[in-house]
């Protein structure tokens, strides 16, 4: 409408898209894990993993929380969703993240995963805390630096300010990305025909008449 400022319309560009079904502070770390998955071929030889991040990430979803359930393979999905140690271990092994498969009991209890999981420790870094609270949307960061130390002493490092899907990330989410996410989340929940109909209608809302959306 005419009473809406252009700056208000642009505000949507400062929202934080979740590409992955996990706590938002985990988004950039999943992207980091995916990158490291392509670099490290011998995950079984990992000695330790150190994650340097913001106060919030360290104390809410990291080892700074001192919550033993975050290290428990039999913890609930709701708890694992807030365990960056678990999330990072699975994403590092799988090179991906799935809203269902990544949270199953069988997945959480995989021996190789538990080994990596237990090797992870988070640390608050004032640099990341400052970025986390930056009032400038273009500077505000939810990222981290990860250092993986192998048994032979070799180190792998990756750092990312914000998730790739973030409006200021490496590949900001576009319409096709949202549509793909919709298909992934509704797979086996609704038929492909219904998904196609729904997407067609919601992208044509301005031309729909009363009663057409639920036909």
Predicted regions and their residues:
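Terminal-appendage/accessory-domain detector
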Residues: 2-215
């Amino acid at each position: 409408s005419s009473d809406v400022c252009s700056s208000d319309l642009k505000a949507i560009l400062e929202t934080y898209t979740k590409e992955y079904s996990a706590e938002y502070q985990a988004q950039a770390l999943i992207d980091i894990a995916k990158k490291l998955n392509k670099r490290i071929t011998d995950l079984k030889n990992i000695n330790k993993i150190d994650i340097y991040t913001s106060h919030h990430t360290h104390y809410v979803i990291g080892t700074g929380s001192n919550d033993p359930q975050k290290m428990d393979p039999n913890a609930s999905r709701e708890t694992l969703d807030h365990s960056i140690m678990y999330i990072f271990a699975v994403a590092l092994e799988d090179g991906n993240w799935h809203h269902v498969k990544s949270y199953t009991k069988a997945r959480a209890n995989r021996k190789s995963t538990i080994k990596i999981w237990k090797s992870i420790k988070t640390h608050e870094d004032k640099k990341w805390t400052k970025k986390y609270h930056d009032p400038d949307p273009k500077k505000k960061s939810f990222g981290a630096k990860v250092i993986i130390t192998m048994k032979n002493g070799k180190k792998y490092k990756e750092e990312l300010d914000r998730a790739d899907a973030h409006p200021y990330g490496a590949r900001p989410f576009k319409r096709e990305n949202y549509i793909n996410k919709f298909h992934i989340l509704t797979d086996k929940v609704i038929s492909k025909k219904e998904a196609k109909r729904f997407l067609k209608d919601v992208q044509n809302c301005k031309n729909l008449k009363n009663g057409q959306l639920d036909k």
